[in-house]
Structures are given as structure tokens and as C-alpha cells.
Amino acid sequence: MGHSSKTTEFLGLTFNLSNVLMITIASIIVLLIAVLTTRVLSIRPTKAQNFMEWIVDFVRNIIGSSMDMKTGAPFLALGVTLLMYIFVSNMLGLPFSISVDHNLWWKSPTADPAITMTLAVMVMGLTHYYGVKAKGVKEYTKDYFRPIPLLVPLKIIEEFANTLTLGLRLYGNIFAGEILLGLLAGLATNFYSQNIALGIIGTLGAIVPMIVWQAFSLFVGTIQAFIFTMLTMVYISHKVSDEH
């Protein structure tokens, strides 16, 4: 592939400009979808309103599968935001990628582990925050010593494992999809430098696999957005529910 990403330093921190660009674009797209689909609400909903209501109902069902809605209602906005943001982020690099002077600018932001691990750390931080808010510091801390204190090290390891798997699962699936799409695109174009006939053959041979893989990547990106949102709600339910 041979692509790198342009970086800059600010206040001693190094920022990947491609990541900054793509997460900004993803955020703007999600904001536009939310505004355009809820701009005019009515008893007889438009197609746009129906679409947003379907997303809200879908997330409500995800929450309801892990906790009762009385407990889970405050997390509905979080779930909808996560689902939409991760889905849009997964899709951005699917149709094409853009590189300038060997610097990759247009890609799926979730194809970078820094983005997915940041999302995972933020989510796990929220689970602890909501747990403390629901139970208080003393009662929440006691949960780590139940049913027996010997399990405390395992529970701490579990927290780190949950964070790693949440972030790396999303990254691995999206990154692998973009790598294979890049290889197929290379198959379609690289042979033109040797021979036009070989280039045409390579293009024809790559068209069907690219269409199939893009369709599969669309499915995987959708599933990964669902899994990330679902696991977020499961982890929150473990922290705020009395039975846990």
C-alpha cells in the first residue's frame, strides 16, 4: 500500500491530520442526519422522521435486551449517537480512499487503532462514571469484592480486556476490509504500467471481487456498529444494575 499519514504537533502532542479530518467529517454527517430527520416532527411522520424513529426504536431494543428501560432510558441518546457515528465512520472509506503525495487523507477513521481505542476508553470510562453515579463510590467499590475478595485481580484484568477487545475488534474488521479493497484496486490498475491488455484483464478480474467485498464490508461495518453499541449497553448495565 505504501501510504503514510501527515501529522502535526500541538502543545507537545502529535495529531494525525487524516484522523482529525475524517472524524470531523463523520461528526458533521451524523449531525446533518440528526438535524434533517428531526427538523420537522409531526404525528404523520415523513420518511426522514420514520428513519430516525426506526433507529431510536432499534437502539431502545438493544438497551432493553440488557437492562430494564427505566434504568436504561438515560442512555438512549448515547446509544443512538454511537450507532450512527460508528456506522458512518465505518462507511467513509468503503467507496474509495484518497491519497496525496503518498499521504492518505480519505479513509474510514475506524480503520485506525488510535480512534477505536479512544472510543473504547471513553465508553469504559462512562460505564464507571454511571456506575458510581447510580450506586455511590462506596457501594460501587464493594462490587469489585463480591462475591469474594480473591476475584478483585480478575475483575481488574477483565476491565482492561473489555477495553482492548472493544476497540481492537472494531479496528481489525474495518482495517482488514480496507486493506483487501486496496489490494483489489491495485490488481485492477497496476498491470496498465506493463501492458494495456493485461490492465484490462486485471480490471475485469477485479470488478466482481470488489463488488462482492464492498457488499460484505457494508455488512461487516453495520454489524460492527451494532456490536459496539450493544456491548456498550451491556457493560453499562453491569455497572448500574443491582443484580451485578
From Swiss-Prot:
SUPFAM superfamilies: F1F0 ATP synthase subunit A (SSF81336). Keywords: ATP synthesis, Cell membrane, CF(0), Hydrogen ion transport, Ion transport, Membrane, Transmembrane, Transmembrane helix, Transport. GO terms for biological process: proton motive force-driven plasma membrane ATP synthesis. PROSITE patterns: ATPASE_A (PS00449). HAMAP family: ATP_synth_a_bact. It comes from Bacillus pumilus (strain SAFR-032). InterPro entries: ATP_syn_F0_a_bact/chloroplast, ATP_synth_F0_asu, ATP_synth_F0_asu_AS, F0_ATP_A_sf. F-type ATPases have 2 components, CF(1) - the catalytic core - and CF(0) - the membrane proton channel. CF(1) has five subunits: alpha(3), beta(3), gamma(1), delta(1), epsilon(1). CF(0) has three main subunits: a(1), b(2) and c(9-12). The alpha and beta chains form an alternating ring which encloses part of the gamma chain. CF(1) is attached to CF(0) by a central stalk formed by the gamma and epsilon chains, while a peripheral stalk is formed by the delta and b chains. The chain crosses the membrane at residues 17-37, 74-94, 112-132, 148-168, 171-191, 196-216, 217-237. It holds the Pfam family ATP-synt_A. It is found in: Cell membrane. NCBIfam families: ATP_synt_6_or_A, PRK05815.1-4. One of its GO terms (molecular function) is proton-transporting ATP synthase activity, rotational mechanism. Key component of the proton channel; it plays a direct role in the translocation of protons across the membrane. Coiled coil: none annotated. GO terms for cellular component: plasma membrane; proton-transporting ATP synthase complex. PANTHER family: ATP SYNTHASE SUBUNIT A, CHLOROPLASTIC. This is ATP synthase subunit a. It comes from the Bacteria. Belongs to the ATPase A chain family. It is a multi-pass membrane protein.
